[in-house]
Amino acid sequence: PYDKMKFSTPKTLSEIAAMIGAEKYVGPADFPVTGINEIHSVTHGDIVFVDHPKYYDKALRSAASVVLIDKDVECPEGKALIVTDDPFRDFNKITHTFCPFVPSTAMIAPDAKIGRGTLIQPGVFIGNDVEIGQDCVLHAGVIVCDGTRIGDRVIVNPGTVIGGDAFYYKHRPQGYDRLLSSGNVVIRDDVEIGSLCTIDRGVSAPTTIGEGTKIDNHVHIGHDTVIGKECLIAAQCGIAGCNHIEDKAVSYTHLRAHETCA
């Protein structure tokens, strides 16, 4: 399993606060923290950040154990708070500390796991900590970024990029800040992906393509999206981040999906 969002050993509230230079936290100093996650994917033990009033209640009521927030609020029972002037910046600090970018040293990373019978055509790049199943075909020029998981009998056509960073930015007076990505892409068995497609990794959870789904050329799938089993996605569809497409859905050419689809 790929679980960069979970710390290798639990941390404490005071340790995380010190790491990001936060002077104020609410809760016991030894309150346990086990990972980080974006608001759409949080689980018990996680830190979630929130820096917009629209999402304060959602974050405070979420499954997250620690809320990194830019406002003094009442701490919900069973949770802890870290209060800073810039939760976005500080969430990036945590991500960078526990999920740093590791440059590749070869076209196929030494720790990549490639199953029996899988064919890798010339010019394919396979990043760190990638797992590819049996009897797959990766055609020329395919890029498989760090942490990607690919099942059995998957076909990926030329020029497709799997696992690029999420398109997630915060606007500031001086420009845009990118939210660092610590998620990955999971492609289930018997998926086929056309040429020149792009599938972004999740911000802090997997972007998932379900078993048996077929994707045409020139399709973009945004971060943290979950596509069900046996879907058909035609050429030039654009699916934004955090969408959920149910099993056996058919998406026709030029579809633009901006929010949860079923």
Where are these regions (language model features)?
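Short helix-capping/hinge SLiMs at alpha-helix to coil transitions
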Residues: 6, 127-128
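Single conserved hydrophobic/aromatic residue that forms the stacking wall/gate
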Residues: 254-262
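Short, small-residue-enriched loops and turns at beta-alpha junctions
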Residues: 177, 205-206
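Terminal amphipathic alpha-helical/low-complexity segments used for targeting or macromolecular assembly
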Residues: 1-105, 110-111, 117, 153, ...
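Short coil/loop residues immediately preceding or within conserved phosphate-binding loops
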Residues: 182, 204
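Inter-heme linker and motif-flanking segments adjacent to c-type heme-binding CXXCH motifs
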Residues: 201
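A generic local secondary-structure boundary/capping motif
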Residues: 145-146, 175-176, 183
